[in-house]
Amino acid sequence: MASKRILKELKDLQKDPPTSCSAGPVAEDMFHWQATIMGPSDSPYSGGVFLVTIHFPPDYPFKPPKVAFRTKVFHPNVNSNGSICLDILKEQWSPALTISKVLLSICSLLTDPNPDDPLVPEIAHMYKTDRAKYESTARSWTQKYAMG
């Protein structure tokens, strides 16, 4: 069941990739993908290329994939391990969602962080109280880690 669904998503992704994202299996393992997300141009992540790993559970799509940033990113909803705080990867997951939609949601999270449900409270606090400092820090991390 899972592998059939994952194959279908891979075909759909190759046919119609989401804007500024790409994804596919690592080697021969269909349950382990790597994705790239281009930093949105209207965000401090602009110009960066962010690597993301995707691990599908055996009962996908009834359980969400595990998605994490491999590239360091300064963001209130992404911690130093790359874990992403995004409702659709947790309690809001639905089997109707696809990796394409997940990648687009991560892109929009880069543009519009959710400081009210932070994974890193200090960054969320900076985002709310000193937006200029947040944006310049996010920009310098992007240049340092995502433009190699």
Swiss-Prot record:
Residues 1-147 form the UBC core domain. It holds the Pfam family UQ_con. The keyword Nucleotide-binding applies. It comes from the Eukaryota. It catalyses: S-ubiquitinyl-[E1 ubiquitin-activating enzyme]-L-cysteine + [E2 ubiquitin-conjugating enzyme]-L-cysteine = [E1 ubiquitin-activating enzyme]-L-cysteine + S-ubiquitinyl-[E2 ubiquitin-conjugating enzyme]-L-cysteine. The keyword ATP-binding applies. SMART domains: UBCc. Its EC number is 2.3.2.23. Keywords: ATP-binding, Nucleotide-binding, Transferase, Ubl conjugation pathway. InterPro entries: UBQ-conjugat_E2_core, UBQ-conjugating_AS, UBQ-conjugating_enzyme/RWD. The active site is at C85 (glycyl thioester intermediate). Coiled coil: none annotated. Pathway: Protein modification; protein ubiquitination. GO terms for molecular function: ATP binding; ubiquitin conjugating enzyme activity. GO terms for biological process: protein ubiquitination. Expressed in seeds, pistils, siliques, hypocotyls and leaves. Belongs to the ubiquitin-conjugating enzyme family. Interacts with SINAT5. Accepts the ubiquitin from the E1 complex and catalyzes its covalent attachment to other proteins. This is Ubiquitin-conjugating enzyme E2 28.
